[in-house]
Amino acid sequence: GYRAITIGGVRDAHFIAHLNDIQSAVVEKIEQTLAGQGTANSYTIKFHRYGLDGVMGPWEPMRQPGHEVGLLVDVVGKTEAIAQTVCGLARSTLLHVSFPGRLATAGNVAFPFSPAEIPVGPVYEFNVYHLLEIDDPERFGRMEVFN
């Protein structure tokens, strides 16, 4: 597959408080928009929320959000076009999605780059972990020990 990302920042406390619901609404809107286009099961979307749980995800022990959150939307599609399209839909939906307490209608997220969707290229997945028991550690290469 191929990866496309978009990066944005949020400072609206209401947006941050409703981020789980907002993410669900974004995914649902994309599914509705692409329904019947033959893209079902051809992409994944991940939201990395730096300043909330961007590093540890659901294992984050500190559940107190800061005053701003950095959003990295990570889309992997079967084709580059699918990745770019879904990333663009995610960006535009995040920008204009409604949520309780919303005051600004001009945009919810600040995007530092234009164009906001960044093609990252082919995706590689680590899927094999090689371990080999050997009798002689120097058989496959030189080993040096330093003190």
Which residues does each PLM region occupy?
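C-terminal non-catalytic interaction/assembly regions of soluble proteins
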Residues: G1-N147
